[in-house]
Amino acid sequence: GFGGAEGLAAWLREHGVDAFIDATHPFAGTMSFHAARAAATTHVPLLALRRPGWAPGPGDDWHDVGSLTEAARLLPTLGRRVFLTTGRMGLAAFAALDDLWFLVRSVDPPEAPYPARTEVLLDRGPFTLDGERELLRRHRVDVVVTKDSGGAATAPKLTAAREAGLPVVVVRRPPVPEDVPVVADPEAAA
């Protein structure tokens, strides 16, 4: 990285940056706050680019939560076989749930601690609707947990869950820092 907000501010000054865009992942909250602090320190205008989040539709059984810890508390009331698609970080929030079985899909191998009854599936989107239907069926999943990352690459799991009548626990995005304007697509940034 840049060495925190101070390192990013130094880099902006050193390179004579006139304006910059925070196009990080919606859950890269620390980096977004560093960018906001660096922008405030250097008086360089900052714009956040965030793809739209997902929204529930008719037939969806979504449970909106503010954190992975809150998701873990809710899970035992919703199902026993969990498709966990929150990435490899943060699995410790679920580690004590020994009575549940987890299918963890991640780009990279997860770091311990994580639940004892876990099967890891290393995979990277985009995913197809047919593939997600088959995955839910084959693993007898009865609840899905995801972060609201938005975008089309990983959205088919939500459609497959709706079709199967499964509850989905959706972790809300962290807020964009105050006073940072947000746009949903690059054209709006112009």
What do the PLM-derived regions correspond to, one by one?
Residues 94-126:
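Histidine/lysine/aspartate-rich catalytic loop segments that bind and position anionic ligands
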Residues 18-19, 81, 142-143:
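Structural motif
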Residues 1-15, 122-131:
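Glycine-rich, highly charged phosphate/nucleotide-binding loops
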Residues 69-103:
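Internal active-site segments that recognize and position negatively charged phosphoryl groups
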Residues 8-68:
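Glycine/small-residue-rich loop that forms an oxyanion/phosphate-binding "nest" at active or ligand-binding sites
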Residues 1-3, 61-69, 181-189:
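Short acidic-hydrophobic, aromatic-tinged amphipathic segments that line or gate anion-handling sites
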Residues 139, 148-160, 168-190:
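C-terminal functional extensions of proteins
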Residues 49-55, 68, 88-91, 105-112, ...:
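Short, polar loop motifs at secondary-structure junctions
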